[in-house]
Amino acid sequence: MKGLFAEMAKRAVRLVSGENIACVCCGAELFSDKYFCERCLDSLPFNAGYICDKCGRAIADDYPVCPECKAHMPDYTSARSAFVYSGEIVRLIKEFKTGEKYLAEAFADRMFPILLSQFRDADMLAFVPMTPRAVKDRGYNQSELLADILSQRCGIPLERELLVKTRETAEQKELSAAERAKNLQGSIRVHERTVCRGKNIVLIDDVMTTGTTASVAAKAILRAGALSVHVLTVASVPERSQNI
């Protein structure tokens, strides 16, 4: 019940003021940060420890490439994420995907410094696509919202039509990595009217789980002639051996 009142308070503040003066996580009053209170900032699982150089996941020790990438090297050039997919971030991303579009600003605010520091050579931003039916059902593509905000902030052009989702695919959550790859095979392609040849692309998404979706999308972009495809997400699932 306490959580319900906090959520109602957050929504009321936004409706009246048009600004975030309450923490998007707990509803407490904000002072030093634009989106999160001090307590939540201290508890959020930022992806700031050891990470895999390739997929950017949180790993248990300081080694260059995680075992999963060694076993199945992804097609993207590299990937990074602002948070580890655990704790309150899991709840917030679920809310983001089920109507709470305002969270795009808070997430993009944490992705922006990574974009500037890690992907300085980016020529173009893109996002993981959804089918028109899926966008209609949800009302928006959450990855497009993130990419749009990041493009406005950094000035890197956003190519909204770079990738096309050609068909509906089965829910990915319960599938193994091999099943995900089979499920997504041929489901993402580069739009024939877009040009990515010779460009460095940053692909935006909300969550990286196994990385299969990002890898399939990157493969299509690289086949179309892009120089590189880096991936930037709100959060990524940590290395399997870690208990975060």
Give the location of each predicted region.
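Glycine-rich phosphate/pyrophosphate-handling loop used in enzymes and phosphotransfer proteins
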Residues: 1-204, 209-244
